[in-house]
Amino acid sequence: MKKRILRVFLALTVFILLLSLPVRADEAELYQNSGADTLMEVLPEEAQSLLQNVGADPMETPAPDAAIKLFSALSEGFRAEWTAPARALLTLLASCVLCRLVQEFAAKELSYAVSVCGALCAAVTLLSPMASLLEQAARVTDAAAVFLLAAVPVYAGLLCTAGNTVTAPTYGALSLAAANAVSVLSSAVLIPVLRVFLAFSVASAVTSFDLKRLTDALYKVIKWALVLAVTVYTGVLSVQTIVANSAEMAGGKAAKMLVSGAIPIVGSAFSDAFSVIVSGAALVKNGVGAFGLLASLAIFLPLCIKAAAWLLICFCAGLAAEVLGLKPLASFLNGCAAALRLLIAAVCSVGAVAVVSAAVVLCVRGAYA
């Protein structure tokens, strides 16, 4: 009897060892079957180029220094494009100094007209790059929405494969709803409102209409709406994920204990082998989640850096105009700065949705870990 039990035990041990051999192959197959190979294709060309430069691939776990390489590539790209903002800053500062000199030598009645001319000169300098930034913002928000629509089903499928069968449906529903909301709101609300805000800022600076209260109210409404939307999405997704994952962890531990106790002799070995297989799925999940995080940063960070550079220029030129007493010019430059702050906030809010969606995939633990 003892010999028979020993033979059965040895046979089962060999069988379990043979099952554990193809885990790495199954991991590569899981990458292929998850649909992660399509994530690179839906990204815009600039984001693809950045990710290729840092060696990020949706079919592999990113290197530990991939984020550092990404920021290095972004800084190199900014250094190659800094000449246009620098020329604009010099032009604006020269306009401020010239307008002040003309005011000193011209009649007092012409003082306001000279300042308005300075504002018009600043408009000629800034409106073209501002319009370009708004167009890029529209493309970036659309690209983020497209990436989310492609990535969320992959994320949810990998969560299910890793044993998170409760978390995945809730996560998928919330993230897909956010992706659709981002696409609609960015094209129908955010970008048109930013254009209207910029137009009001120009009109307030070069006409007798005082639209400052209107632009200030519009600025506050947009800012708080963005903060509220991102906070609600992040809070609801985080709470739902934490609660669901806690239930899954408890259920997973109970299942492992049941298998270990129900199957004599080799129950614990079966439980450990199953944990190894699920851990392979979790590695794939984490690799795709890390790529999604890098891809989200590659989508919206280049535009944020450009907008921040132009915001710094508007701030410096506006400060110079205020010091020199050029109120219409200072009003226009401050309006442009406010529009750029809203643009950065809008793009960062969309980026935050994409980053949080990928970060949740990284943070959720497997149910049978």
What kind of feature is each model-predicted range?
Residues 95-99, 127-134, 154, 158, ...:
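Alpha-helical transmembrane segments of polytopic integral membrane proteins
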Residues 101, 133-140, 202, 213, ...:
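Membrane-spanning helices that line or support transport/gating and their immediate boundary helices
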Residues 120-129, 148-165, 185-193, 197:
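Mid-bilayer segments of alpha-helical transmembrane spans in multi-pass integral membrane proteins
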